[in-house]
Amino acid sequence: MEDKRSLSMARCEERNSRGQDHGLERVPFPPQLQSETYLHPADPSPAWDDPGSTGSPNLRLLTEEIAFQPLAEEASFRRPHPDGDVPPQGEDNLLSLPFPQKLWRLVSSNQFSSIWWDDSGACRVINQKLFEKEILKRDVAHKVFATTSIKSFFRQLNLYGFRKRRQCTFRTFTRIFSAKRLVSILNKLEFYCHPYFQRDSPHLLVRMKRRVGVKSAPRHQEEDKPEAAGSCLAPADTEQQDHTSPNENDQVTPQHREPAGPNTQIRSGSAPPATPVMVPDSAVASDNSPVTQPAGEWSEGSQAHVTPVAAVPGPAALPFLYVPGSPTQMNSYGPVVALPTASRSTLAMDTTGLPAPGMLPFCHLWVPVTLVAAGAAQPAASMVMFPHLPALHHHCPHSHRTSQYMPASDGPQAYPDYADQST
C-alpha cells in the first residue's frame, strides 16, 4: 500500500512539473493595490525578479497589459488634484456661463488636470487627449461644453481671438508593479494665449468678443444675378440704350444730326405705329415741316418743328387729355393751341379706329394720349398743337354733346394775349 501511495504522489509531482514547464497553469488575477499579498509577497516568483527569465514570458506580458489599462485611464495621464472633479450645479453651473468666463474658471480650478496655467500666467496649457476625455466627453448631467469634438473647441478659441503659441509633445514613462520594463505614453500639449485672458486679470474677460465668420455667397446665385439684371431693365433704360447703341435689327432713317440739335431719328420696331407728333420750337424753323400755320395767327419765325416717332417703347397710356378752347377759336382747318401736359415731353396716341391717319375722331372732346419723356437734345415745348381738330358746331348724329357744355371765352384760359391777337 505504501508503495502505491508513493507511486501516485510521484506521478502528481511529475504532472505539476510538466504543466509549469509548458505554461498551462491558470493565470492569477492581478493583486489589489492594498491587499496584503501585494504589500508583502510571501513567495515572490522568480519571473518578477528576473525579467529575462524564460520561465513564463506570455504570463508576464499579459499581466502588464491587464495592469496598464486602469493606470492609463486614471493615474498615468492625470496630475494629483482634490477629490471631486464635478463642477457645482445651480447658479455656478459652468454650462450657463459665457465661453471666456467658463474657460477661465476651468483653467483656474484644481478640479481638472487636463488644463492649467503656464508659469507666467499669460497662456493656458491643454493636454489634448486628456482634455477630450475629461471635459468634452462628460455625460449630459455634468457637461461643461456643448460640443464633444476637440476641433470644434479649437475653432471657438480662434473665433474669440486666441492664438496658438507653440505645441509640445513628450512621453511619459511608467512602471507596471515591480517589473523593470517601462511603458511610454505620448502626450500632446497645446499653448494658447490671449491679451485679455490673464490669470490675475479676470476683469478683462468682458472685452473678449466673438467674431462672426463671413460666408461666401453660393456660386449659383452669382451666376443668376447678371441674368436677372439683364431681364429686369426699366423702360427708360431700354430707351436710353436704343439711343446710344441701336440694335442691329433696327432700321434707322439717316438724317442730319448735330451735337445740340433737336433732330431725332425715326425708328421702326415692335411697337405699334403712332400718330406723328408736333412740338413747336421757337428757336429752330424747318422748311421741310409737313404742317404749316396760317399767316394771320403765327409769325414766320415760330413755325413748328415736327418730330415724327414711329415706335414709342414708353409707359402705358395716361388718362384722357382735355383740350380747352372756345368754339369761335376752334376750326377744322387750323391747329388748336393747348397747354402741354409736362415739359420736355412728346405726345403720341394710337391710330386704330381713326377716320384717317393724322386726324382725330369727330365729336370727341376728350382725346387719349401717351406721354413719353424725350431726350435731352429736344428743347422744352411751351405749347402743343393738335392738327385738324373738328369744329364743335358740327353736329354728330350719334352724339348728344353740343357746344353749350364748353365755357364761352375769348381765347384759351392760360393765354389771355391770344384773344387780343385773334380779334
UniProtKB/Swiss-Prot annotation:
The places in or outside the cell where this protein is found are: Nucleus; Cytoplasm
Which residue intervals are the DNA-binding region? 98-282
> What broad class describes the main subcellular location of this protein?
nucleus
Q: Which UniProt keywords apply?
A: Cytoplasm, DNA-binding, Isopeptide bond, Nucleus, Transcription, Transcription regulation, Ubl conjugation
Q: Which domain of life is it from?
A: Eukaryota
Pfam families, sorted = HSF_DNA-bind
Gene Ontology, cellular component aspect: chromatin; cytoplasm; nucleus
Q: Does the keyword Magnesium apply?
A: no
Keyword rRNA-binding recorded: no
Q: In which tissues is it expressed?
A: Testis-specific.
Q: Where is the composition biased (Basic and acidic residues)?
A: 1-25
Question: Which Gene Ontology molecular function entries are recorded, alphabetically?
Answer: DNA-binding transcription factor activity, RNA polymerase II-specific; sequence-specific DNA binding
Protein's UniProt name: Heat shock transcription factor, X-linked
Q: Which organism is it from?
A: Homo sapiens
